């Protein structure tokens, strides 16, 4: 009950103090106006304040004592996730280098996949290979290994065949390679038989076409006006050359 007695004194002091403070400050400061105090006529009418005893919150609950610490072991709820066995389809090249010097009686059954840069490396013969090249069990024969695939071997064979096919190509002479290089000029698209036939008919009627007629012929034959113009120029040059050869023969 000491708590209730202290609270009772606190409430009584809070009611009495404002009156005494007003009388104390009113003499010093004239600007402060007196507030009407709302006090009861007789303070003896106030009875002692009593508060009910605080009931325990978990007094009647069914909750048992909760331990504040847990066991250091793994709780029973935790179930570790089983990782599947790693079976990679690729063999790293840096693992193969160490495996090449060891004799193997049987092909390896388990491949390991380790992280490595994707940069291409070069074999001793100058061919490039990737570290992610798929190797078949047949590659490991007689304790050795080979990283050259069938695609790379066919590619090198085609390159060697192209060099041999060129009559004057010299792999060590860059000038010879430049002279025998293929032309980079865009190939002209040939006209279809129907287009050539219609252009020949038009050329028989008139060797020179007007601009409007060229646009009309180009629209009918699904060509551009420039293509029709160039074809007629070439056809006139061919006709002049043919006539010149006939006059020489006569």
Swiss-Prot record:
* Single GO MF annotation: DNA-binding transcription factor activity, RNA polymerase II-specific
Localization per Swiss-Prot or TrEMBL: Nucleus
**Keyword hit for Isomerase:** no
Q: Which domain of life is it from?
A: Eukaryota
- From the record, what ranges are coiled-coil? none
GO cellular component, as recorded: nucleus
Compositional bias segments (type: Basic and acidic residues): 149-169
Mind telling me which CDD domains this protein's record contains? homeodomain (cd00086)
Q: Which GO terms describe its biological process?
A: anterior/posterior pattern specification; DNA-templated transcription; embryonic skeletal system morphogenesis; proximal/distal pattern formation; regulation of transcription by RNA polymerase II
Keywords assigned by UniProt? Developmental protein, DNA-binding, Homeobox, Nucleus, Transcription, Transcription regulation
Matching PROSITE patterns: HOMEOBOX_1, HOMEOBOX_2
The function of this protein is:
Sequence-specific transcription factor which is part of a developmental regulatory system that provides cells with specific positional identities on the anterior-posterior axis.
Q: Which family, according to UniProt? A: Belongs to the Abd-B homeobox family.
The record ties this protein, via PANTHER family, to: AGAP004664-PA, HOMEOBOX PROTEIN HOX-A9
In Swiss-Prot or TrEMBL terms, this protein is called Homeobox protein Hox-A9a
Gene label? hoxa9a
């Amino acid at each position: 009950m000491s708590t209730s007695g202290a609270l009772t004194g606190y409430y009584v002091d809070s009611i009495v103090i404002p009156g005494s403070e007003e009388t104390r400050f009113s003499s010093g400061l004239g600007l402060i106006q007196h507030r009407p105090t709302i006090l009861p006529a007789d303070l003896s009418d106030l009875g002692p304040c009593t508060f009910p005893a605080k009931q325990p919150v978990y007094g009647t609950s069914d909750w048992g004592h909760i331990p504040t610490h847990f066991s250091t072991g793994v709780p029973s709820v935790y179930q570790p996730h089983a990782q599947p066995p790693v079976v990679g389809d690729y063999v790293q090249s840096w693992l193969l280098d160490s495996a090449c010097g060891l004799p193997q009686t049987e092909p390896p059954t388990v491949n390991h996949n380790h992280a490595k840069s994707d940069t291409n490396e070069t074999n001793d013969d100058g061919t490039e290979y990737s570290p992610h090249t798929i190797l078949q069990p047949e590659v490991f024969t007689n304790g050795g290994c080979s990283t050259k695939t069938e695609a790379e071997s066919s590619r090198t064979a085609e390159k060697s065949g192209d060099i041999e096919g060129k009559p004057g190509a010299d792999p060590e002479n860059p000038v010879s390679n430049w002279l025998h290089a293929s032309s980079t000029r865009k190939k002209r698209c040939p006209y279809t038989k129907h287009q050539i036939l219609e252009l020949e008919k038009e050329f028989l009627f008139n060797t020179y076409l007007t601009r409007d007629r060229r646009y009309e012929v180009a629209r009918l034959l699904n060509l551009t006006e420039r293509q029709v113009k160039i074809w007629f120029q070439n056809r006139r040059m061919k006709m002049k050359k043919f006539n010149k050869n006939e006059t020489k023969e006569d």
